[in-house]
Design a protein with these regions (language model features):
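C-terminal binding/interaction regions
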Residues: 91, 95, 133-136, 140, ...
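Short glycine/serine/threonine-rich phosphate/pyrophosphate-binding segments
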Residues: 28-30, 96-101, 125-126, 145-154, ...
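Glycine-rich oxoanion-binding loops at beta->alpha junctions
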Residues: 70-74, 113-134, 179-180, 196
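Long amphipathic alpha-helical segments
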Residues: 1-65
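Glycine-rich phosphate-binding loop
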Residues: 130-168
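Glycine-rich phosphate/diphosphate-binding loop of Rossmann-like nucleotide-binding domains
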Residues: 84-126
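Short glycine-rich or small-residue beta-strand-to-loop segments that form or flank ligand, phosphate
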Residues: 19-20, 46, 86-92, 141-143, ...
Length: 219
């Protein structure tokens, strides 16, 4: 392919194969890259930020599962979880679910058990407390929120595991497209919180998987 160079050894180096970032690529380019990865014996191919049009085009040639909400495509089967523990993906609101599903599906593609806790934001603390057992038993937590982004700080003050904070662009004017949530998360008083870019569910899911596999893979 003249337009792309596959990193066929990434799985060997990092334990996780290359991902296709669909935004900015034509449907033809996405298909050719995915086909090349399948030919290189990749059992599962993850495609992020994929349009529905591209999904229909690729799906006509490959075994593709497409998630409309997160605009994520998966060629092949999601593997059996082999991570050490569970990854919890929590959102402040229902509006954060597109980013959350990108994170959750990414983690699942890389062999992790994922627990989804959606719409458990700080406006109703009881909703979060109803899931305290899930939070305290997690190996790593992905906390996703827009508005003021307080969810990550609250979870970070409760959990004894790493928390990956994901600011989203959900919110009104002074949210500044997710900047307010990003700054809140970066300035959190709670320890053990790391922050990825605005709406970067993929980055959070990928990092969560790396943490969940630090002690090797579960047999």
């Amino acid at each position: 392919m003249g337009f792309a160079k596959l990193d066929t050894h990434r799985g060997i180096r990092q334990g996780m194969a290359e991902v296709i970032y669909g935004a900015g690529k034509t449907k033809e380019q996405i298909l050719k890259i995915a086909q090349a990865m399948v030919e290189e014996r990749e059992k599962t191919v993850l495609i992020t930020r994929m349009s529905k049009e591209a999904a229909e085009y690729v799906g006509a040639s490959l075994d593709l599962h497409y998630d409309d909400l997160s605009r994520t495509g998966i060629v092949g089967q999601i593997p059996k979880p082999d991570g050490v523990g569970k990854i919890v993906v929590a959102t402040g609101g229902t509006s954060d679910m597109p980013v959350a599903e990108e994170a959750a599906l990414t983690a699942q593609v890389y062999g992790n058990e994922v627990v989804r806790l959606y719409d458990v934001g700080v406006a109703g603390m009881h909703r979060l407390m109803d899931h305290i057992e899930d939070i305290m038993s997690a190996r790593v937590i992905v906390a996703i929120a827009g508005m003021e982004g307080a969810l990550a700080s609250v979870i970070g003050g409760m959990a004894d595991c790493p928390v990956i904070a994901v600011p989203t662009s959900v919110g009104y004017g002074a949210n500044f497209g997710g900047l307010s949530a990003l700054l809140s998360m970066l300035n959190s008083c709670a320890s053990g919180i790391s922050v990825v870019n605005i709406d970067n569910g993929f980055g959070a899911g990928y990092l969560a998987s790396m943490i969940n596999h630090l002690e090797g893979r579960k047999e």
